[in-house]
Amino acid sequence: SNTRNFVLRDEEGNEHGVFTGKQPRQAALKAANRGDGTKSNPDVIRLRERGTKKVHVFKAWKEMVEAPKNRPDWMPEKISKPFVKKEKIEKIE
């Protein structure tokens, strides 16, 4: 399996939380679902790929959307859907 680990960093470079995904975007979506960003005021998510000096920077937010018609019983009618938009890649020295 080629799952990659992405570590969530804050502005100070402290790292908390690992999100997995085959692509940085996948990990960013998982992180976005935990944040409080909105479309007008998105969170900034910085994910460093484990074992590299690359930090993927995303803008992230959630929107309430209608759940799919064939949703399981436990799923509410409205669900929050994460969105991410890649901003840039930073290199750590």
From Swiss-Prot:
* Single Gene Ontology MF annotation: DNA binding
Annotated region described as Disordered, given as residue ranges: 1-43
Tell me the keywords, alphabetical order: DNA-binding
Q: Which SUPFAM superfamilies match?
A: Chromosomal protein MC1 (SSF102875)
In its UniProt record, which GO terms are filed under biological process?
Answer: DNA protection
Q: What does this protein do?
A: Protects DNA against thermal denaturation and modulates transcription.
Q: What is this protein called?
A: Chromosomal protein MC1
Provide the species name. Answer: Methanosarcina barkeri
